[in-house]
Design a protein with these regions (language model features):
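Active-site acidic catalytic loop and adjacent metal/ATP-binding pocket
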Residues: 1-6, 10-13, 49, 135-182
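A short, glycine/Asx- and small/polar-enriched loop/turn
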Residues: 4-8, 59-64, 215
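A conserved alpha-helical element in kinase catalytic cores
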Residues: 14-61, 78-91
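ATP/Mg2+ or Mg2+-diphosphate-binding catalytic cores
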Residues: 16, 109, 113-125, 223-250
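Conserved short submotifs of the Hanks-type protein kinase catalytic core
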Residues: 61-73
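Conserved kinase catalytic-core helix
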Residues: 71-103
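Hydrophobic alpha-helical segments that form the core
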Residues: 110, 212-222
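Active-site Asp-x-Gly
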Residues: 160-210
């Protein structure tokens, strides 16, 4: 959840649904602040932490939050495939110089954390299907040191501002193969997969990319189910995604 603190040019990012699977969410928000501050100083096109307050996580009234520079909301639309692919390649180049090492595949931990919770939407058999898919797909990931990643580098996390696109929402930053970041966009049907990969340019293992795309879809399934607990409009999408896993289950 984000709150514009008008008239100050500051936006508060407040942890909401993430707390259900990330009890240590403050650590995730701090990693996001640290990385965004590094990228800002490196001249990368990112939404910067607010210079109005210290770049540290704040705890107030039982809420966990961080503070960011306000950017006027853009119009609807996504960047094109060439923009996404080339900007991700450039971002990865800068991220290779980041001295810290965030946890490997950090967002994947959300899936077993969700499946261990009391379910309000999915049945016990649904949980069995998703648990099996998670075990199978994570078993297909190649052991690799990887590099620092955005963590959730979908086209929706590029924001138009001042005639350029800016990366934001680094909360899921982690270490892993570049295929994990690419899959955030190539798994979507909104943009052309082949054009994104061509614009990215650097070699990517096709098998690992397919595995990461399936893990992205699995992650999307559990997040829609989580959102549906407080946003009923997300329920139908969660049900539709779950149906695709049941259909492909052995």
């Amino acid at each position: 959840m984000v709150v514009y603190l008008s008239p100050s040019p500051v936006v508060a990012k407040v942890a909401a649904s993430t707390l259900a699977v990330r009890p240590d969410d403050a650590a995730w928000l701090q990693r996001e602040l640290d990385l965004a501050l590094f990228l800002t100083r490196a001249g990368a096109p990112v939404v910067a932490p607010s210079p109005e307050v210290p770049a540290t996580v704040c705890h107030r009234g039982g809420h966990v939050m961080s503070f960011w520079t306000y950017i006027r909301p853009p119009g609807a639309g996504l960047p094109d495939e060439v923009t996404v692919g080339s900007m991700l390649r450039d971002l990865h180049a800068v991220l290779r110089t980041y001295p810290a090492r965030p946890p490997a595949f950090a967002p994947l931990g959300d899936i077993p954390a969700f499946l261990a919770r009391p379910q309000t939407l999915f049945t016990a058999d649904d949980v069995r299907v998703l648990t099996g898919a998670y075990a199978r797909l994570t078993g297909e990931l190649a052991p690799s040191a990887g590099q620092v990643l955005h963590g959730d580098a979908g086209a929706g996390n590029l924001m138009a501002a001042g005639g350029q696109w800016l990366w934001h929402d680094f909360e899921d930053t982690c270490t892993g193969p570049t295929a994990w970041d690419l899959a955030a966009t190539t798994a979507s049907r909104r943009l052309d997969r082949s054009r994104i990969l061509a614009a990215y340019g650097d070699p990517v293992d096709p098998g690992q990319l397919r595995t990461c795309e399936q893990l992205r879809r699995l992650s999307l399934t559990i997040w829609y189910a989580l959102y549906a607990e407080r946003l009923p409009e997300c329920r139908q999408r969660a049900v539709e995604l779950m149906a695709t896993w049941r259909a492909s289950s052995p």
